[in-house]
Amino acid sequence: MDINQLIEIVKKKICVNLNIEQIEIQDKTYLHIKHSTHQKDKFHIKILIKSKYLQNEKKIETMRKIYKILDQEIKKHIHSIQLKIN
């Protein structure tokens, strides 16, 4: 899977499962390329979400929801996730 495919899957899953107004996903894999733990087919993504619904939740609860939604992608294709909720 390439990064563009992963981004589309992540967007779709989050949009279907959470009440959001807007989502942007950025590839930040370049930040990890020289790390000893870097794996070729694992990506670092930054997820920016605009959601009044999620703003009212504790960040840890939002993270748990997103990790549950993206469970398969995290196991196979995601090295790390940065999350920002507005």
For each predicted feature, which ranges?
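N-terminal, polar/charged subdomain of small-to-medium soluble alpha/beta proteins
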Residues: M1-N86
